[in-house]
């Protein structure tokens, strides 16, 4: 059993010990499905961390978006600093899939921008699954897409061991076959160079270099190096260098795949010609012939993923292998915010197939392109082993699958009760709301307001701003990482009120919010259903004086059930506090998200400084750094500033400007020390 070392400054409290014990017992007894029904702020992540530590299973934690996945990954890394906690999301900064619009005869080619840092994290996850058993992978729903063939990926790894004889030419050929490229001047991820008896490799899964030192034909030493300074970081006895891409196709299989593609093309052309679709047949023949030529010559072509079924040797209709297939047999699945995530799993396949069907019908792709797809919902659950659903409002499907295997977690370790819920009439609601906002603002507390329409949210935001309220408006067009920045500004007190159409956002931690306002609460629909109301009310559940105001003229069934459930939990919490002499206290979580800061910084640096907001922020910071007047810099800004200075330092070193690089190094050291002292 792998040894997880759970480190936390506190122990399980309230009903956490009972929930942990029940879940651990269920896993050990082989229960297929269980549900953790945990109210907002009760420490569900800590409970799951204890479950993983006590069962010792490799775990996949599935979240419904990359924002929540990053938040969970940060928390698990704090709980398990000595274990492998990995982050696996889609590596596209921008993605426009291939499509065809028959009405306007418009073909849209695939365009994408890959984030190299996310790609590195994805490779790090699969490498850890091959080499360790104490692995927790926090992933978004993108993990159900094809990810090569695990057995081929493992078999293709180039192995080096101290003392063994090495055929350097053969090893270099293997690296090239594994999508590494030779560059003797600028070595980064996915590249290698040879200097005399020294081979240096930039592995796809980390930012350190690997140096293989030879004495004749014998491997004399294997070392990890700092890519900028060349400093030796660690010596190794052996190492596996995994492919630079997850899709690895041996030459013999490639030849078989090319023949299979040619056979399918011949059959498809016959069908199209019989249907009188001569234009489509000509288009398909030209495109596929070009792709086949590229595959034969260089082993790659644009849109190669559309031939994934042939390259993997799969039969028609069979599911692709994905991240799940890299896990060992005894892995554990945790589905966070399962009432949303499980629904996403069902929707992914249908959306993908609708687009592919049009491309196939009009001669842009072979029918086998439809098998380059995400898993169907039923395929995913067949692959899944033991599963724990986690939600404050689990869906009916999860509860049915769990069949009574339910662990409820209602009591917060902080002693904070569920919010008071009050229903008020809509007449005069805006003036009443304005008065409530002013009360909270004086106490430096925050307010969330959720409306039914975008227009209503815009009008309300304008009205509040005209009345000297510090307010921001959150809408669907805002980039997910910019959204995090807006929420962090709310937490840091840059403004007092956040208005939006859908602010329930499962898993969002906002301890500063003391008031949640739901306008038009009696308008039945998705945004005012029982689960949505409970989730929205829960945004104030981390504040000692949390309150939810529902403006409505009628009491709907959804409202009644949501209010009843909130009151039930509140009574349980109050009774527990009185019995144990607990006084509610604030949660006090820091407003930070290191993974998102890291990824966003990378994305913006790749725009070559075109992002005005970044220039404005970093300009002030660099001025402060240059003048050594750093006392006014916020702690939350330091990780981003350090990352920027490291980039500048590496560029200076690359340009042989060593004095500037040394100066930047000293500043980085100073800011790291400040960060350590204050965290």
From Swiss-Prot:
Helicase C-terminal domain segment(s): 429-591
Any one annotated GO CC term: excinuclease repair complex
GO MF terms, alphabetically ordered: ATP binding; ATP hydrolysis activity; DNA binding; excinuclease ABC activity; helicase activity
Keywords annotated in UniProt: ATP-binding, Cytoplasm, DNA damage, DNA excision, DNA repair, Excision nuclease, Helicase, Hydrolase, Nucleotide-binding, SOS response
PROSITE patterns with a match to the protein in the record: HELICASE_ATP_BIND_1, HELICASE_CTER, UVR
Domain of life the protein comes from: Bacteria
Gene3D superfamilies in alphabetical order: P-loop containing nucleotide triphosphate hydrolases (3.40.50.300), UVR domain (4.10.860.10)
Function: The UvrABC repair system catalyzes the recognition and processing of DNA lesions. A damage recognition complex composed of 2 UvrA and 2 UvrB subunits scans DNA for abnormalities. Upon binding of the UvrA(2)B(2) complex to a putative damaged site, the DNA wraps around one UvrB monomer. DNA wrap is dependent on ATP binding by UvrB and probably causes local melting of the DNA helix, facilitating insertion of UvrB beta-hairpin between the DNA strands. Then UvrB probes one DNA strand for the presence of a lesion.
PANTHER family: UVRABC SYSTEM PROTEIN B
Subunit: Forms a heterotetramer with UvrA during the search for lesions. Interacts with UvrC in an incision complex.
Similarity-based family: Belongs to the UvrB family.
Protein name: UvrABC system protein B
Organism: Prochlorococcus marinus (strain MIT 9303)
Lineage, top ranks: Bacteria, Bacillati, Cyanobacteriota, Cyanophyceae, Synechococcales
Underlying gene: uvrB
């Amino acid at each position: 059993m792998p040894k997880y070392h759970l480190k936390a400054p506190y122990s399980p409290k309230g009903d956490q010990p009972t929930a942990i014990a029940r879940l651990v017992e269920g896993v050990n007894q082989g229960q297929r499905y269980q549900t953790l029904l945990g109210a907002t702020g009760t420490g569900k992540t800590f409970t799951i961390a204890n479950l993983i530590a006590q069962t010792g299973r490799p775990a996949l934690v599935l979240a419904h978006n990359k924002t929540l996945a990053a938040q969970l990954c940060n928390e698990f890394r704090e709980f398990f600093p000595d274990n492998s906690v990995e982050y696996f999301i889609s590596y596209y900064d921008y993605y426009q899939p291939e499509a065809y619009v028959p009405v306007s005869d418009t073909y849209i080619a695939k365009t994408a921008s890959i984030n190299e840092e996310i790609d590195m994290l994805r490779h790090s996850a699969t490498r850890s699954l091959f080499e360790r058993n104490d692995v927790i992978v926090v992933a978004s729903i993108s993990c159900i897409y094809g990810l090569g063939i695990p057995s081929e990926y493992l078999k293709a790894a180039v192995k080096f061991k101290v003392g063994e004889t090495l055929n350097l030419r053969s090893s270099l050929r293997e690296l090239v076959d594994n999508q590494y490229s030779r560059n003797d001047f600028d070595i980064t991820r996915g590249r290698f160079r040879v200097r005399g008896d020294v081979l240096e490799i930039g592995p796809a899964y980390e930012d350190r270099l690997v140096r293989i030192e030879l004495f004749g034909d014998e491997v004399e030493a294997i070392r990890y190096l700092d890519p900028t300074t060349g400093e030796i970081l660690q010596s190794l006895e052996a190492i596996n260098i995994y492919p630079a891409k997850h899709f690895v196709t041996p030459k013999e299989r490639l030849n078989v795949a090319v023949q299979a593609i040619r056979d399918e093309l011949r059959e498809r052309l016959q069908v199209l010609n019989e249907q009188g679709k001569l234009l489509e047949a000509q288009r398909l023949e030209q495109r596929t012939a070009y792709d086949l030529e590229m595959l034969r010559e260089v082993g790659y072509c644009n849109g190669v993923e559309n031939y994934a079924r042939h390259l993997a040797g799969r039969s028609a209709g069979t599911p692709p292998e994905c991240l799940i297939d890299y896990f060992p047999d005894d892995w554990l699945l945790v589905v966070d915010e399962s009432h949303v995530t499980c629904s996403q799993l069902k929707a992914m396949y249908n959306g993908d197939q609708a687009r592919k069907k049009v491309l196939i019908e009009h001669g842009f792709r072979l029918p086998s392109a439809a098998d380059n797809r995400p898993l169907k919902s039923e395929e995913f659950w067949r692959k899944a082993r033991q599963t724990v659903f986690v939600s404050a409002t689990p869906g009916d499907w999860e509860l049915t699958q769990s069949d009574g295997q339910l662990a409820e977690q209602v009591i917060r370790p902080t002693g904070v009760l569920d919010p008071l819920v009050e229903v008020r009439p809509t007449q005069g609601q805006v003036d009443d709301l304005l008065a409530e906002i002013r009360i909270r603002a004086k106490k430096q507390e925050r307010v969330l307001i959720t409306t039914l329409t975008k227009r209503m949210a815009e009008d309300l935001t304008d009205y509040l701003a005209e009345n000297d309220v510090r307010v921001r408006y959150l809408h669907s067009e805002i980039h997910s990482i910019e959204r995090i920045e807006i929420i962090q500004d709310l937490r840091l007190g840059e403004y007092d009120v956040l208005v939006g159409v859908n602010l329930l956002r499962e898993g969002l931690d906002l301890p500063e919010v003391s008031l949640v306002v739901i306008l038009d609460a009696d308008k039945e629909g998705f945004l005012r259903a029982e689960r949505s109301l409970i989730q929205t009310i829960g945004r104030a559940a981390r504040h000692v004086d949390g309150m939810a105001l529902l403006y409505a003229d009628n009491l709907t069934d959804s409202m009644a059930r949501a209010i009843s459930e909130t009151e039930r939990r509140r009574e349980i919490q109050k009774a527990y506090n009185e019995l144990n002499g607990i006084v509610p206290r604030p949660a006090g979580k820091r407003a930070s998200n290191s993974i998102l800061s890291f990824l966003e910084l990378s994305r913006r640096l790749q725009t070559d400084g075109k992002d005005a907001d970044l220039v404005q922020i970093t300009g002030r910071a660099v001025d402060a750094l240059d003048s050594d007047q750093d006392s006014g810099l916020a702690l939350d800004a330091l990780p981003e500033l350090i990352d920027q200075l490291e980039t500048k330092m590496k560029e200076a070193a690359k340009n042989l400007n060593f004095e500037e690089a040394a100066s930047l190094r000293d500043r980085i050291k100073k800011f790291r020390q400040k960060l350590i002292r204050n965290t």
